[in-house]
Regions:
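Conserved catalytic or regulatory cores that recognize and/or transform ribose-phosphate-containing ligands
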Residues: 1-194
């Protein structure tokens, strides 16, 4: 069964090695890991970014589920491309799962990023220098990510991983793969292609 593996690993210098290792974890659970880079881009004269976008969506449509690496990327939240992919698969009605190699909650990560440019309002909530409230529901990331994963029957696994291993530690990923394999084995065939 095909499972789309979303995440910013595609930006790593050793992306191919990480992809191979993740595929091996999936194979041990009877799944085939699919990455955005697997499908050749259409040669139709469109700009490269648009061809990548189209190839990524085609890959997702071919998969029964998604596992998203939601480890904070260039800020306190997940990679926006990965977030889009998670929402796309959720919109297709496919099971979605997530993991993060940072255990700190979204609210505390956001406050750490804002530093002294955040303060408490009179009602006790935090706000930033633009007067915007800081989301703090004690969740792993934005409520729409945690909520979408939960609504899809998925899990959101976390691990407190040292910074040096942030993009290579696969313990939380492996737990997601095991959960996805159990979920996909126990659902009717028509549900995985909805």
């Amino acid at each position: 069964m095909l499972i789309y593996l979303a995440g910013p690993e595609v930006f790593l210098a050793d992306a191919a090695a990480v992809v191979d290792t993740k595929r091996a974890v999936c194979a041990r659970h009877g799944l085939t890991g699919v990455f955005a880079t697997d499908l050749p881009m259409p040669a139709d004269g469109l700009p490269e970014w648009h061809r990548l976008y189209r190839a990524n969506e085609a890959q997702m449509r071919s998969c029964a589920a998604l596992i998203a690496n939601l480890t904070p990327f260039r800020g306190p939240s997940a990679d926006p491309g990965t977030v889009y992919e998670l929402g796309f698969m959720r919109g297709l009605g496919r099971p979605v799962f997530g993991y993060s190699n940072v255990a700190a909650r979204f609210g505390s990560r956001t406050l750490a990023e804002l530093g002294r440019s955040a303060w408490r309002r009179a009602d006790g909530a935090w706000e930033d220098s633009a007067g915007m409230a800081v989301e703090d529901f004690d969740l792993h990331d934005n409520l729409m990510l945690d909520g979408g994963i939960r609504a899809a029957g998925g899990v959101f696994e976390t691990a407190a991983v040292p910074e040096a291993a942030r993009w290579h530690d696969l313990a939380a990923f492996a737990r997601c793969v095991a959960a996805a394999a159990r979920r996909l084995r126990n659902q009717p065939a028509s549900a995985s292609s909805a």
